[in-house]
UniProtKB/Swiss-Prot annotation:
Disrupted gene: phenotype observed: Controversial. Hypermotility, up-regulation of flagellar genes and up-regulation of flagellar protein FliC. Decreased viability following HOCl stress; no effect on motility was seen in this study.
GO biological process: regulation of DNA-templated transcription
PROSITE patterns: HTH_LYSR
Family note: Belongs to the LysR transcriptional regulatory family.
Protein name, as recorded: HTH-type transcriptional regulator YjiE
UniProt DNA-binding region: 28-47
Encoding gene per record: yjiE
Source organism per UniProt: Escherichia coli (strain K12)
Length: 303
């Protein structure tokens, strides 16, 4: 028996479920209650798992408890392994195939509305969908911690390398726009002093891009009027005539065509963006792997 075989021989399946429960609860007491065992027994089982595989899975020096870097990788692998085992058992017993066909995706807010409907409509009817629209940074955390099969997000250097895999979906741009008046002219312009800015949250992906652009162009004089992490909300506030927003091209095409929004033409203020699908580079369950293959072949159409 090789080393890996010996490790597997010494691991009990219940320890793996203990591990997933502790990652979810981030607290030994709560996880022990959830697993219906005493806390000392639960702690011993987690320690036994760590000793069996030879790494510490949790950083116990922080509150709440956090996965270690090795723990994040292990979590993704074990979650997929147990999901596949449960799926196979359900199939053998003639159970519902909903869980077997489910694809779990976490997506940036703007991509969940601007991209996912197009992708789902082009997919074969093999999958059921569980979609969560969240902030970009939170989506990345879910991928790292194995809570999503894949995420739809934006360019991230850290996710373009191992232990991740990626598919480049499309390129787009952020345009500075505002509402039009009754004559079709822009209500605001970038040269006016203290123009009202409708901005993304400071720590969001698009917020960081826009703030870097504003810093480079110190000649712009603005006063932040409204802040949100959601492109659709910023678009609505812009349509209501409240200020200037940088919005993704794919989210405003209809409003530009109808004249409800006006692009404020300053080429140097147009910001390029790239959207990607990311996953862990460990093997997923067969349904998720099929989805990934289909996604690679897909022609992305944004309307």
């Amino acid at each position: 028996m090789d080393d890996c075989g010996a490790i597997l021989h010494n691991i009990e399946t219940k320890w793996l479920y203990d591990f997933l429960t502790l990652e979810k609860c981030r607290n030994f007491s709560q996880a022990a209650v959830s697993r219906n065992v005493s806390q000392p027994a639960f702690s011993r089982r987690i320690r036994a798992l760590e000793q069996a595989i030879g790494v510490e899975l949790f950083n116990r020096q922080v509150t709440p408890l956090q996965l270690s870097e090795q723990g994040k990788i292990f979590h993704s692998q074990i979650r997929h392994l147990l999901q596949q085992l449960e799926s196979n058992l359900a199939e053998l017993r003639g159970g519902s195939d909903y869980a077997q066909r489910k694809i779990k995706i976490a997506a940036a807010h703007s991509l969940s509305l601007g991209l996912l409907p197009s992708i789902i409509s082009q997919m074969p009817p093999l999958f059921t969908w569980a979609i969560e629209a969240i902030d970009v940074d939170e989506a990345v955390d879910k991928l790292r911690e194995g809570q999503s099969d894949c995420i739809f997000s934006f360019h991230d250097e850290d996710l373009l390398e191992a232990p991740f895999d990626h598919i480049r979906l499309f390129e787009s741009q952020l345009f500075p726009v505002c509402a039009s008046d009754e004559h079709g002219e822009a209500l605001f312009n970038l040269a006016q002093p203290h123009f009202p800015l409708l901005n993304y949250s400071r720590n969001s992906y698009m917020g960081r891009l826009i703030n870097r652009t504003l810093t480079r162009h110190s000649e712009l004089s603005f006063s932040t009027f409204f802040v949100s992490s959601m492109s659709e909300l910023l678009k609505q506030v812009a349509l209501d005539g409240c200020g200037i927003a940088w919005l993704p091209e794919y989210a405003i095409q209809q409003e530009i065509r109808s004249g409800k929004l006006v692009v404020l033409n300053r080429d140097e203020l147009v910001i390029p963006i790239q959207a990607y699908a990311y996953r862990m580079n460990t093997r997923m369950n067969p349904v998720a792997e099929r989805f990934w293959r289909e996604l690679r072949e897909l022609e992305i159409v944004l309307s």
